């Protein structure tokens, strides 16, 4: 029976109900984490608008330990007086009424990123709780909200000499149900961008969960941004092309530098808001660059001999550019402002590019010559690659209609249901072929190390047999003229390599290929890394597969603590003592794992000694700090067995009038310094470490002995006791460490790595594209010195090195 469709079925969503009902319209995707982080950006953008108006110099963003986020600025502060129409405070209007704000009349803000008056009210609507504090008129105001509704009117809670706004919000987990944790890297990327775009603002970011903290204050504006993006690349034009001017109320700022890479990297911003999908400013930029450079090449006769046709792609190969426009009333395709659609922008940018770039090329003839040479060379390589493809197609060696012979394809035709495993080596490929589900799992074995595409020209890439097989198997092509995501044959591309150094290298080469040649596959979430087990543990007829060292450590501790007996001279309750010891071991392991994931990670020996070393309370007394660190270093030098020399020093922190100790490790040619800063010494982690030491000291006073089977061990150190227990436990176990996938038979490979019900896979994502770009340049690029420095800096953190 069909329900009657009449006026009773028409629902009116009032106030913020519409936001809660359809949050994606206002904030973006609430499942993939982008909408969650957009909440922070909406508030930060308001602070930036205050800066653009000349009233804000400092912004502080904090991720709190309960996963709430606070944003504080020193702007004018949200208005607190009573709104003449709504009869409530202006602050409450802004927080609870859609399309309210001070950016509609262009009087309070000439330029702003906020346009629709929905940003902060949307954040409030999608928050379980929100706290608002305003510093204004020498008064401190406060108001709290629950699910978008005020719990009480705005009230004065004290006096103040500062101005600004503080907002702390707790996202509603009824709205954000999938990805609920704020990612430091995503926030860091955006705040770094804002610092480059607004070089007069100091921006702080702190994560109380991990003690990560950064300050962003880049002088040099977008020219400094270009240098940051081109880090570890060879610049083609040493003098960055830069101009800033205003035309038809459009303020345009552009910086460009070409480099020796093969990828273009253009970032677009409107009123400081990024447009990941570009828009009319990007269209105008591309048209202006292509037209101007072709005109200059023709006028100066650079291309007389070869008459090579120059395309837009050729002019932009290796180009890094920042386009930043400021416009009074920009038009975007949606509330998330991912694409600019203001039609008047395109022609203005195109004409300004033409005027300023011609002037730059004439005033910088050496830079101009190198730029044009690169462009012509790119065009020649493109033509050579096209001819090579045509020849190979005629020969049948690159027939994109024919799948590579080594591919064992699946029966499924729907890409959403299909998987392809890129397997290291023919041996593992054979096992994978036998163990797979033929219905939807394809196998492509890759022989040896593929080309490093970071420093390989395109014509060489398409002639590489392994890469050609991979490109053909995927079906979507990598050439810009032929690339089509609709032709992709698999939506699950799984990299499966050995757990050794060679496997890690091959995995990195494949990730470099996808990042540089098929970045959209990573953005769409199609690329995965298989997690084959590192260990097989066998006791009698029982077998268990363990995926990594951390899990192996947990498993060993769990088994080691079983069937133990603890005795002491007082003959106290054995079960009670065992529980105490198990808690100490559990806390010890928890601290080690937590510290390794923390920015304040110290080497194991330092961490262990901090447990037994007295807690450092008084950082204001230089002698106390000096004595404390010297005694710690003395212990470290006595206990170290790895030829490491430990030295200490203390440094005065002028801001807080305290003394902070540090430890320097010297091993062979490597020197690493670990600072024990006030943030760490007052952190939860340091309290846990020293508290564990105090617990163990009391436990140790009773002279406890541990029995495992027929053996007895005196408990005098947590780490050594645990190692002894694990060693004794291993006697009844057979532990196999898999170095290669080929060591597994087909059934084992299926059960551990390929069965969707039991396998573990890592989805490849990019939280911070700029940092990812710099990392690929460092590790896979031509420059040796940055790579050497990176290795030296991280050498002491390396684990599981094959020797």
Curated annotation (Swiss-Prot):
Keywords, ordered alphabetically: ATP-binding, Cytoplasm, DNA-binding, Isomerase, Magnesium, Metal-binding, Nucleotide-binding, Topoisomerase
GO-annotated cellular components: chromosome; cytoplasm
Co-factor note (free text): Binds two Mg(2+) per subunit. The magnesium ions form salt bridges with both the protein and the DNA. Can also accept other divalent metal cations, such as Mn(2+) or Ca(2+).
Documented EC number(s): 5.6.2.2
Keyword Cytoplasm recorded: yes
One Gene Ontology biological process: DNA topological change
Residues of the site described as Interaction with DNA: 449, 452
Cofactor(s) the protein needs: Mg(2+); Mn(2+); Ca(2+)
Catalytic activities: ATP-dependent breakage, passage and rejoining of double-stranded DNA
Binding, Mg(2+) 2: 498, 500
Residue pairs linked by disulfide bridges in the UniProt entry: none
Matching Pfam families: DNA_gyraseB (PF00204), DNA_gyraseB_C (PF00986), GyrB_hook (PF21249), GyrB_insert (PF18053), HATPase_c (PF02518), Toprim (PF01751)
InterPro entries reported in the protein's UniProt record: DNA_gyrase_B_C (IPR002288), GyrB (IPR011557), GyrB_hook (IPR049353), GyrB_insert (IPR041423), HATPase_C_sf (IPR036890), Ribosomal_Su5_D2-typ_SF (IPR020568), Ribsml_uS5_D2-typ_fold_subgr (IPR014721), Topo_IIA (IPR001241)
Positions that bind Mg(2+) 1: 424, 498
Location relative to the cell: Cytoplasm
Domain Toprim: 418-533
GO molecular function, one term: DNA binding
The family this protein is said to belong to: Belongs to the type II topoisomerase GyrB family.
Subunit structure: Heterotetramer, composed of two GyrA and two GyrB chains. In the heterotetramer, GyrA contains the active site tyrosine that forms a transient covalent intermediate with DNA, while GyrB binds cofactors and catalyzes ATP hydrolysis.
NCBIfam families in the cross-refs: gyrB, PRK05644.1, PRK14939.1
UniProt miscellaneous comment: Few gyrases are as efficient as E.coli at forming negative supercoils. Not all organisms have 2 type II topoisomerases; in organisms with a single type II topoisomerase this enzyme also has to decatenate newly replicated chromosomes.
Main function: A type II topoisomerase that negatively supercoils closed circular double-stranded (ds) DNA in an ATP-dependent manner to modulate DNA topology and maintain chromosomes in an underwound state. Negative supercoiling favors strand separation, and DNA replication, transcription, recombination and repair, all of which involve strand separation. Also able to catalyze the interconversion of other topological isomers of dsDNA rings, including catenanes and knotted rings. Type II topoisomerases break and join 2 DNA strands simultaneously in an ATP-dependent manner.
Protein name: DNA gyrase subunit B
